[in-house]
């Protein structure tokens, strides 16, 4: 409860760093639907912000598909309580909407969204989050921004800033933010498959062991592929082209 007596989210910012193929988009879809139906934000707006329209569309379609994921939601959908419009997806009972937007700082200025999903933040060069968050913070009593990523190869961009921030002692004691950083601590740990759950906590379900092992084995003779495997699958920020693992190292 804030100083005005309004019930608000305790957590304003969440950073989720999770290995590729772990179902981040599906997880975000359930968060959006929960907000649209139960968030109490009459007339509120939610956004997915991605580096291009294709990726934004992927998350948007995940949310739309989830509207048919249960009997109750399917009834809502069939009776046009969930409605697709030119602007996005609307839950007509509360006039809450979900829209997609590309990573564009100018377009982000002056918004007033209540829930913001920043997808694949490892692709962002500049920090668009503050442009969006500023509008939410100033105009919404109850707002939340979620930054999701599998890690990536772009250095000194938004991703590196978020990792540094959410690993800091200051952020550890910040009650208004929360970080879930699933990643290896160093590249030596990749040689033992038992450590892979540090970056892929649901491995075996999403993603499948066989798929990750295949990528790992393909990368053993290729430094560039090793960089990508360590970055996207194991959450390690990589920038050089050394050999990190060979078939002889594998456990």
Placement of each model-derived feature along the sequence:
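Post-Walker A helix-loop "phosphate-sensing" segment adjacent to the P-loop in P-loop NTPases
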Residues: 35-43
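Conserved Walker A/P-loop ATP-binding site and its immediately adjacent core
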Residues: 44-65
């Amino acid at each position: 409860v804030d100083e005005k007596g309004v019930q608000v989210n305790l957590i304003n910012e969440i950073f989720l760093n999770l290995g590729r193929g772990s179902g981040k988009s599906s997880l975000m879809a359930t968060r959006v639907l929960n907000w649209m139906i139960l968030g109490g934000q009459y007339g509120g707006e939610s956004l997915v912000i991605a580096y291009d329209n294709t990726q934004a569309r992927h998350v948007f379609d995940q949310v739309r598909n989830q509207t048919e994921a249960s009997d109750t939601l399917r009834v809502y959908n069939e009776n046009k309580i969930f409605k697709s419009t030119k602007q996005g997806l609307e839950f007509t009972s509360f006039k809450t909407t979900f829209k997609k937007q590309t990573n564009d700082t100018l377009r982000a200025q002056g918004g007033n969204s209540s829930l913001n999903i920043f997808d694949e933040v490892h692709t962002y060069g500049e920090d668009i989050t503050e442009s969006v968050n500023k509008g939410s913070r100033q105009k919404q009593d109850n707002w939340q921004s979620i930054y999701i990523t599998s890690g990536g190869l772009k250095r000194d961009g938004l991703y590196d800033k978020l990792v540094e921030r959410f690993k800091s002692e200051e952020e550890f004691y910040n009650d208004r933010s929360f970080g879930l950083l699933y990643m290896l601590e160093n590249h030596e740990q990749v040689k033992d498959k038992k450590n892979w759950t540090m970056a892929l906590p649901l491995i075996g379900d999403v993603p499948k062991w066989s798929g990750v092992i295949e990528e790992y084995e393909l990368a053993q003779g290729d430094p560039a592929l090793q960089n990508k495997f360590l970055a996207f699958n194991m959450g390690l920020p990589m920038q050089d082209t050394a050999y990190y693992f060979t078939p002889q190292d594998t456990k």
